[in-house]
């Protein structure tokens, strides 16, 4: 059973022993812009998971589970795992000061959407919650903790929080130390490794579904505790696996709410580049990522307009069919798309 919490849909897909899809379900959601922040309600995440899983069929047959979700952003919790501030997603561009300072400090490009940039920006802003932080993680890491009790993260997702050393497959020790020195005069009751999830590579033991976790996912009661759950990953990692592009000198392009290319490198870059984000594959190999915040948002708005028009005419709407026909018809268009461009 694979579950992904994307920026526009929460998906659940079950495959058989021959890797063929047998059941699928989804739930549509969207980020809210509240008080200058792009955010999602975590309660809606659980509603979406339950809704998507209703269509999966007999969950009693599930033998393994994987969670993935949108990467980066800022989810900060206290010692009892109470959310300290609303989820700040990867869509926010509110950490320019922190991003610039950390890039200079590390000698490594730190994009605004990365978790470490959000954390340090909160420090620079003297936000009240900072001293109460006990855990920070990604959306996949949060869901995984809730269903297994394990505070872990797949190395690919972890590399979008703070830089990862591709040799050790965990957080870059030198950069962790530099950050700790940077905040040492603040008197916080934590250091960086105290609050980060443990980084795991693909295939490592990331825990098992708990009875409480099974209830959170499946209202039918068919999903049983004890199912192994793989290290939670980011949506970029699942994209690399799905396109069979995890080996060095391979790559893929993702076209979703955001667009990005992922190129698996055979050696380090010679220097940092502002437009290239260094992350990893789910097994820890270096990846050069070029990311644009907007891709299908304009298209989705047009498709929803078509959907409303069909509904006004009383015509049943299957969104998968609408997108399928639109994409296939687009192949007949001019190579330059009629001279139109959607600005990022």
Question: Where are the regions a protein language model picked out?
Answer:
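Short, conserved phosphate/pyrophosphate- and ester-handling motifs at nucleotide-, phospho-/glycolipid
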Residues: 41, 92, 235
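Short beta-strand-loop/turn "lid" adjacent to the catalytic site in phosphate-handling enzymes
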Residues: 54-90, 109-111, 140, 144-165, ...
